[in-house]
Regions:
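Carbohydrate-binding surface patches
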Residues: 1-5, 248
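Aromatic-lined ligand-binding clefts that engage carbohydrates, nucleic acids, or primary amines
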Residues: 103-134, 166, 228-256
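An acidic-aromatic loop/edge-strand motif
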Residues: 6-93, 124, 139-148, 153-227, ...
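Regulatory/sensor and coupling segments of signal-transduction and defense proteins
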Residues: 84-96, 100-109
Length: 256
């Protein structure tokens, strides 16, 4: 005999017996994690070329091509046999050094304290030095986004309203040097700019599209709270209907 509890029967509505309950007060909308902005275009400078505003994947493939790897990024093609790909690293010389610069904009309306609290996320920091507006920064020990391969960098003190630049400098090409997007995390909104997106002040406050509200790259939770006054009688059941809702999972909590 197991200790599994018997499932309660599913509620089946009887036509004509449902009554809509109107909310009281204004709905509360709150983002439960820091927002994020991705920057996936960059300038790439090597001893052989100087490319501007390149999509990261094109920059990555071109970087391998320039250094004698005709297939481009080997890790995108097939599973490595023995150490075939790792052994490619021996062919990269000192003159294969490169510099990748990511430009992004911060709206002057951003609160100064929020600006200082912004962090950057850069993959594989052991392969290059990271600098923000010319100031070299190191990863914050024990702080990472998603997993430990995405360490955080405290860059807020070096940021400024307007154009900013995060730069990666590699002393030489490396077989693991996949030039990927960089990310910025903080309590801000992300809005379309003349080119790409920019970090702006504000908080999500209404129902509707996250993308249009300033969360185009956000993938965590948003809490929506609404008050209802109801009278519970014997035999009464309550149903929550999410109209025009697009999402992965919705969790409903009653009184916390």
């Amino acid at each position: 005999v197991g200790d599994q509890k018997a499932k309660e029967p599913e509620y089946t509505a009887v036509s004509g017996t449902e009554t809509s309950v109107e909310p009281t007060g204004v709905i509360s909308v709150k983002r439960e994690s820091d927002n994020i902005m991705m920057v996936n275009y960059l300038d790439l400078k090597t001893s052989k070329s100087d490319k501007k505003d390149v999509y990261f994947m094109n920059a990555l493939i071109g970087l391998f091509n320039e250094n004698g790897v005709a297939m481009g990024n080997p890790w995108q093609h097939k599973i490595q046999y023995k150490k075939t790909y790792l052994e490619l690293d021996a062919q990269f010389k000192a003159e294969s050094a490169f510099e990748a610069s990511y430009h992004f904009n911060i709206n002057p309306n951003l609160n100064a304290e929020v600006l200082k609290s912004i962090r950057a996320v850069v993959e594989r920091p052991e392969l290059w030095t990271v600098s923000i507006n010319g100031n070299e920064v190191s990863k914050t020990e024990g702080r990472y986004w998603i997993d430990k391969s995405f360490p955080e960098f405290a860059v807020g003190q070096f940021l400024k309203p307007g154009k900013n630049t995060l730069t990666l400098k590699a002393p030489r090409m490396h077989v693991l040097a996949e030039v990927m997007p960089v990310y910025f995390i903080g309590d801000f909104l992300v809005k379309p700019a003349k080119q790409g997106f920019e970090i702006t002040d504000g908080n999500i406050s209404t129902l509707g599209s996250w993308r249009e509200a300033g969360l185009p790259f956000y993938s965590q939770k948003v809490a929506y709270s609404q008050t209802y006054k109801v009278t519970k009688a014997d035999g009464t059941a309550f149903k929550v209907k999410l109209s025009k809702w697009n999402g992965s999972v919705a969790e409903v909590l009653v009184n916390g």
